[in-house]
Amino acid sequence: CLPHCPTYRVTGDERRSPRGRIALMRAVERDGAAPDQDWYDAFDTCVGCLGCETACPSAVPYGYLINATRSAITSERRPPFKLLVGLRLLSWPRLLRWGSKAIAVVQRLGLLRRTGLLPDRIPFRSQRAKNPGSRNLRSGEPAEVVLFTGCVMDVWQPSVHAAVIDVLNAAGIAVERSGDAAGCCGALHEHAGLTDDAVSHALRVTAALSDGRPVLVDSAGCGAALKHYGRLLGSKAANEFSSRVYDIHEWCVDDSRVSSLVASVEGRTGRPIVVVQDPCHLRHDQKCHDSVRDLLRPIADLIELDDEGLCCGAGGAYQLLQPDLAQAARDRKVASVHRAIRSESSVTLA
């Protein structure tokens, strides 16, 4: 697992590896060792990419172990204040929108970098899709599927949701947005060890989307969280809900109407060159990253990165809490992208 761990690749420190972290878990749980700051740092620096799970021949459930450990840590030690504030915002969609607008003004004035509180590259200034409500349903038809819009994605990257709805509508599929009724999926709360908060979000989502329709997700982290509600909530209803959650690529590949749409545009504008970068939670958690390739291959020439799916370092809130490690992982990923496109004059990164 060591070559697949971004923090071990950066630090070379065994304590910053999956194997080392599991050893530290055992030292406290089985041997009664007292946690010190180095012990806490080992878990704080884990990005949670789960690349180690994919590489592990023994199928050690590292994701479950790290979440359980962080939950135990949180019961003894509160997470950083700025993380708690950020996670609280995710529970209030309107407040998140207004807060993002305020931060966007600070960003536009060039003041955000001076504060050192948030990375300047976060797209606070992204505009919402025009008239997103008009895209909810096609011509008054009952929606066949629900698009999970979440919290941050809906505020900072609404164009992704709009593009998904455009594609599905073009294929003749009516779509309904989950909107604020469902809200946040709770993934970041669970990763932070705030299990009770994660459960509250999961209960809200499952209650809002309980009518049996497929739930499509265009964010890998959200999709992974929704697919794990059965484990998190431990109920029959939660397992039923998770069984009808699909990553958007996964669902589109299996839908004949989308396949027909793809076939209709094949060759119309030539074959673009696309470099594929897998989100960790699509590749290592949901394990449905091949569906991206299956969807694109008929209409594009694909280039694979040479890093075997190594994490980009973003990790949700990780880039805010561990900026140096996140930047080092990002630099490695950017170098891999540059190697992939060095001989191409025009490419798209997907």
Model-inferred region functions:
Residues C1-R9, D36, Y40-V60, G309:
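Cysteine-centered iron-sulfur cluster-binding motifs in ferredoxin-type domains/subunits
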